[in-house]
Amino acid sequence: MKKHIFLSCLSVSLISCGPSSKEAIFYNDGIMGIVNKVTVAQNNFFDQTDGHNIDSLVICQKLYAQKSKESLDEIAKLNAFANKTGYLDAAKVFVNTLNSLANNEAKQMVEIMTKDTSSVTELDIKTVSDLSDKLNKETDEATKLIEDAQQQFVKEWKFELDHNHDKKHYKH
């Protein structure tokens, strides 16, 4: 009987402990997988903005918009971790920001950059430059927000990100 009571108390105490560091790592990997999908697509778009290959620019902008939409759908399916939403909220802001940039500023840049070169004006060039600056600024702000939230999450759940490897290794 004493053994049964002990095991019951032990199982209740283990259940009430909440998520483990390993579960936090898994959650982090899920969020970062979604974030990285849209980040890679945005970087591919940026790589094509030199104007040398207009077809690639158009394709990369469409892929950027598609990946950002997919990321929005995926991030919307995630739940809070241990009833805390800070990290998830930052990820949602990040993905929403990149989605908006893909469908507005990046799209406007492509519309201008795909014009016949003889019809491109100085105002068009300035507009592309301004749009590019806005893309960079808003991406940097969203990146800082999610990086700060990730660091807080890592600290709270007591694991470390090891950025010295191609694949992240975690210490807990």
Give each language-model segment a name:
Residues I31, L57, Q61-Y64, S68, ...:
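Hydrophobic packing residues in well-ordered alpha-helices of helical domains and bundles
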Residues S71-V93, K107-M113:
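Short, solvent-exposed, charged loop/turn and helix-capping segments
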